[in-house]
C-alpha cells in the first residue's frame, strides 16, 4: 500500500509510468481520435410551415385557453337552463328535469371546469370583468386585455351555438314552431330581469354580485391569505357560484360576466331572434350585464386591496409605501 501511495502522489516524467495511466483511464477510441476531423451529423430541420404553425400556436395559446374556458362555462350553464326549462313542456319531456338549483349547479360546474381547463395556461379569468380587474390591481398586461376579451366573447358565441344545436328540436317544440323565437327561449342563453325590477335595481344586483365575486377571486388567489392550491381553486369557485346563484341569482339571472351574456346574445341575433335582443329595456344588454359587472369587479378589487391585502402586488400598497418613504425623507 505504501508503494502505491508513493506512485500516485509522485509524478513521473515518463509518459508510460503508472501514474500517467491512472490519470488517463479511458483508452483512445477511433471516434475520439478523429473527433476533430469528423463532422457531426446535423439534426433534421423541421419544414418552415411547421415552425410557423408552432409560432402561431404559441402566440394564441393563452387566448385559446380563455376561449375554451368560456365555451365550457356556457355549455354547462346554458345547457342546464335548457334542460330545466324546456322539460317543463309535456311535449318535450314526460316530467320536469330539474329546478332552479339545478341551473345554479350547472353554472357553478361550468365555472369550475372552465377554470380547470384554462387556469394553468392563461390564469383562468374567463370573464372580461375579472381580466380588467386583474390588469388594474394585479399587474396583468393591459396589452393582453383586448385579446383575452375577444377570445372570451367568441367562446360565449361558440358555447351558445353548441347548446342551441343540441336543443334545437326541443326549442322548436317549446316555441310551437320552427321559425318562432321569443324571449322565453332567449332567456335560456342571455340574461333577462324580472318584470318588477327597476333599471337601478337591475344595475345594483349585477354590481353587488360581481363585487362579491371579484373580492373572493382576489382572496382565493392571495398567497398570504390561506389561498387554496391551484388544484382546489376550481372547487372553491364552484362553491362560490352555487352560493351566488342561490342568494343573488333570481332577479337578473346573475350574469356577473360580460362574455357570458354578450357572446350568447350575439349568437341569438344570428340565429333569428331579432333586434328585440338589444332593444329590451332600453339597451339592458349594455348597462346591466356588461357595465355593472365591470364596475362591480373594480369595486370588489378596490375593497380587498384597501382593507385586506398585505402583499406588494397591489397599486394601493405601492402608493402607501411611496407616501411613507416621502414622509421619512421629509423628516430626515
Swiss-Prot record:
According to the UniProt entry, where does the motif NPA 1 sit in this chain? 127-129
Reaction(s) catalysed by this chain, per the record, are:
H2O(in) = H2O(out)
Membrane topology, as annotated, equals: Multi-pass membrane protein
- The residues on the Extracellular side of the membrane are 88-100, 166-199, 252-283
GO terms (molecular function) for this protein are: glycerol channel activity; water channel activity
Function, as annotated, reads:
Water channel required to facilitate the transport of water across membranes. Does not mediate the transport carbon dioxide across the membrane.
Q: Regarding domains, what does the record say?
A: Aquaporins contain two tandem repeats each containing three membrane-spanning domains and a pore-forming loop with the signature motif Asn-Pro-Ala (NPA).
Q: What is the protein's name according to its record?
A: Aquaporin-7-2
Q: Which organism is it from?
A: Laccaria bicolor
From the UniProt record, report the name of the gene that encodes this protein. Answer: AQP7-2
Amino acid at each position: 500500500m505504501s508503494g502505491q501511495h508513493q506512485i500516485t502522489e509522485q509524478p513521473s516524467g515518463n509518459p508510460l509510468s503508472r501514474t500517467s495511466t491512472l490519470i488517463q483511464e479511458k483508452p483512445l477510441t477511433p471516434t475520439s481520435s478523429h473527433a476533430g476531423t469528423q463532422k457531426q451529423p446535423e439534426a433534421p430541420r423541421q419544414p418552415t410551415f411547421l415552425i410557423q404553425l408552432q409560432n402561431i400556436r404559441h402566440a394564441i395559446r393563452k387566448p385559446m385557453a380563455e376561449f375554451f374556458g368560456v365555451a365550457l362555462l356556457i355549455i354547462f350553464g346554458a345547457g342546464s337552463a335548457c334542460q330545466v326549462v324546456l322539460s317543463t313542456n309535456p311535449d318535450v319531456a314526460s316530467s320536469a328535469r330539474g329546478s332552479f338549483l339545478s341551473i345554479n349547479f350547472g353554472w357553478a360546474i361550468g365555472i369550475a371546469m372552465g377554470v380547470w381547463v384554462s387556469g394553468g395556461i392563461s390564469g383562468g379569468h374567463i370573464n372580461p370583468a375579472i381580466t380588467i380587474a386583474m390588469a388594474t390591481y394585479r399587474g396583468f398586461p393591459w396589452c393582453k386585455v383586448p385579446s383575452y376579451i375577444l377570445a372570451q366573447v367568441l367562446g360565449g358565441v361558440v358555447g351558445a351555438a353548441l347548446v342551441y344545436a343540441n336543443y334545437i328540436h326541443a326549442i322548436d317544440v317549446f316555441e310551437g314552431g320552427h321559425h318562432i323565437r321569443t324571449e322565453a327561449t332567449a332567456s335560456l342563453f342571455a340574461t333577462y330581469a324580472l318584470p318588477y325590477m327597476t333599471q337601478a335595481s337591475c344595475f345594483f344586483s349585477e354590481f353587488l354580485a360581481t363585487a362579491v365575486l371579484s373580492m373572493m377571486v382576489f382572496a382565493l388567489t392571495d398567497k398570504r391569505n390561506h389561498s387554496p392550491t391551484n388544484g382546489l381553486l376550481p372547487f372553491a369557485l364552484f362553491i362560490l357560484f352555487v352560493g351566488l346563484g342561490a342568494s343573488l341569482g333570481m332577479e337578473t339571472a346573475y350574469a356577473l360576466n360580460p362574455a357570458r351574456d354578450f357572446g350568447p346574445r350575439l349568437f341569438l341575433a344570428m340565429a333569428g331572434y331579432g333586434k328585440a335582443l338589444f332593444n329590451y329595456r332600453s339597451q339592458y344588454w349594455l348597462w346591466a350585464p356588461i357595465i355593472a359587472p365591470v364596475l362591480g369587479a373594480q369595486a370588489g378589487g378596490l375593497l380587498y386591496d384597501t382593507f385586506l391585502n398585505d402583499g406588494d402586488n397591489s397599486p394601493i400598497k405601492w402608493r402607501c409605501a411611496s407616501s411613507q418613504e416621502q414622509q421619512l425623507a421629509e423628516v430626515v
